[in-house]
């Protein structure tokens, strides 16, 4: 359940959704604005879907992607109003990130205090202390390294830049015809 929300929160916005304040599309200009905003605080980075995506890519390379995924799952959990959904999400967060058998266990103090019994009576802030620990871990450890990484320093190439030159496309087509015959 929260995995869909995490995916939704961290999905990169398509270039057509990126606009300057006047509504005109300007992905290169917006990218510079975004990276400046991301550099100002981890909070700003986590509010921007493209920022979250790049930060996730960075954390994946550092083998600590579970930290941002846990943080996002907790944010989604806090917004849940339906009690049954809250119970399901609480159990999923616990089983995915906090239990001894968790597939993506985060390193936080106090996780053992959360038990299955507590999960039956969830409340929106039940993971807050653990989420704060992970936020601080990211803020004072991973975030500073991210700001020095290529994922932050080098702007994403636009689709036009990523297209192959015409000669390479023609050569690739010729090669595919040779191997397909």
Curated annotation (Swiss-Prot):
Residues 41-156 form the RGS domain. One of its GO terms (molecular function) is G-protein alpha-subunit binding. Its main location: cytoplasm. SUPFAM superfamilies: Regulator of G-protein signaling, RGS. It is found in: Cytoplasm, Cytosol; Nucleus. Disulfide bonds: none annotated. A lipid is attached at residue 74 (S-palmitoyl cysteine). The keyword Lipoprotein applies. Interacts with GNAZ, GNAI1 and GNAI3. Associates specifically with the activated, GTP-bound forms of GNAZ and GNAI3. This is Regulator of G-protein signaling 10. It comes from Mus musculus (Mouse). The lineage of its organism: Eukaryota, Metazoa, Chordata, Craniata, Vertebrata.
């Amino acid at each position: 359940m929260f995995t869909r929300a995490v995916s939704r929160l961290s999905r990169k916005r398509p270039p057509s959704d990126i606009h300057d304040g006047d509504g005109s599309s300007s992905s290169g200009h917006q990218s510079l604005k975004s990276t400046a905003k991301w550099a100002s605080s981890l909070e700003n980075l986590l509010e921007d879907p493209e920022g979250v995506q790049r930060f996730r890519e960075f954390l994946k390379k550092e083998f600590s992607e579970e930290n941002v995924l846990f943080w996002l799952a907790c944010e989604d959990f806090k917004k849940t109003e339906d009690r049954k959904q809250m119970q399901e999400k609480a159990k999923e967060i616990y089983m995915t990130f906090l239990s001894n058998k968790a597939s993506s266990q985060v390193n936080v103090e106090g996780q053992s205090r959360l038990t299955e019994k507590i999960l039956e009576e969830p409340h929106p802030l039940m993971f807050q202390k653990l989420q704060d620990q992970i936020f601080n871990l990211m803020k004072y450890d991973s975030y500073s390294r991210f700001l020095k990484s290529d994922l932050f320093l080098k702007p994403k190439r636009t689709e036009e830049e990523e297209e192959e030159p015409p000669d390479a496309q023609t050569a690739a087509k010729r090669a595919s015809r040779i191997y397909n015959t």
